[in-house]
Amino acid sequence: MIKTILIDDEPLACDLVAEYLQDFPQLQVVSRCHDRFQGMKAIQEHQPDLIFLDVQMLKISGFELLELLEDPPAIIFTTAFDEYALKAFE
């Protein structure tokens, strides 16, 4: 089982990703977080294998949150904005 955390400040977007992930039984969503504080707490608590991380959130970007992690797990960036897609590959 792959422990997965969803971090997105838009609850509907978080729900949509969770719905898509239901087609992948090997992924277990252990937490849905809607801000950086919930996200950091969930990461420390669950030690996930994978994080779906929104690029643009209030007060902090997904890129900035990633920099706060000492030993980050695999990250899949999510965004509704084309301009962030290229930066996510860097």
Tell me what each language-model feature is:
Residues 7-8, 33, 51, 78:
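Conserved sequence signature across two-component system core domains
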Residues 19-24, 42:
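Alpha-helical interaction/dimerization surfaces of two-component signaling modules
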Residues 40-90:
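CheY-like receiver
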Residues 24-30:
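A generic structural motif
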Residues 14-15, 85:
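Charged phosphotransfer/docking patches of two-component systems
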Residues 1-3:
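Non-catalytic signal-transmission and effector/linker regions of two-component phosphorelay proteins
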Residues 30-39:
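Conserved Asp/Asn-Gly motif in the active-site loop of CheY-like receiver
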Residues 13, 22, 58:
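The feature encodes the CheY-like receiver
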